[in-house]
C-alpha cells in the first residue's frame, strides 16, 4: 500500500495489515469510551449526615410541641445538614487490553486514509515558535481543524499551536483514539508513520 507524500511529490510504502484494516466501529466505540472514562477525575465528594459537623442531640422532645418530630440537627432536610446519598470519590477507568487498543488505532488510521483525512509530509516544521507562521502554513494547504503528529515533539510547532483551539500537536507516543477522530484532518510526518508502523506491528 502506498501513501502520497504531499510536500515532495513522492510515495511512501506502508503495511496493509496496519493501514488497510476494515472499519471496526464497535471496537473503536469501546476503546473511545474507555479512554474518555479514564480521563475523568472522579474526585467529587459530599458529606453525608454521618460526616457533617453538628450535635447528636435531639432538637426537641418527640411529643407535645406541635412541631414535626425531629431526631437530628444533621438531617438532610435541614439547613446545613448532610447530603442524601452523598457523592464519594470513585475510579471510572475501564480495562482495555493492548490488542484491543492497537486494533482500534489500526482501524482509525485505515479509515482516515479511506476518507482522505490523513495527509503525509516529509517535513512539517516551523523556523520559529510563532502562531502566525503556523496559521499561514495551514492556510497554504487549506487546513483548519487539524491534528499534527510528529515523531518527536517539535518545540516550535508545539508553542505555535498552543493559542489555536482547532490545532493540536502530538508525538507518536502521545496520540490517542479520541484525538485522531476529533479533528477534521491529521497531518503526519514520514518518520511518524514509520514509527507508528513499528509500534502497531
UniProtKB/Swiss-Prot annotation:
InterPro entries: Ribosomal_uL4 (IPR002136), Ribosomal_uL4-like (IPR013005), Ribosomal_uL4_dom_sf (IPR023574)
GO cellular component, one term: ribosome
Pfam families: Ribosomal_L4
Chain positions covered by the region annotation Disordered: 44-68
GO biological process: translation
The keyword rRNA-binding is assigned to this record: yes
UniProt keyword list: Ribonucleoprotein, Ribosomal protein, RNA-binding, rRNA-binding
Gene3D superfamilies: 3.40.1370.10
Single GO MF annotation: structural constituent of ribosome
Subunit structure: Part of the 50S ribosomal subunit.
PANTHER family named in the record: 50S RIBOSOMAL PROTEIN L4 (PTHR10746), LARGE RIBOSOMAL SUBUNIT PROTEIN UL4M (PTHR10746:SF6)
HAMAP family per the UniProt record, alphabetical: Ribosomal_uL4_B
Its job: One of the primary rRNA binding proteins, this protein initially binds near the 5'-end of the 23S rRNA. It is important during the early stages of 50S assembly. It makes multiple contacts with different domains of the 23S rRNA in the assembled 50S subunit and ribosome.
Family per record: Belongs to the universal ribosomal protein uL4 family.
Protein name, per record: Large ribosomal subunit protein uL4
Organism (species): Buchnera aphidicola subsp. Acyrthosiphon pisum (strain 5A)
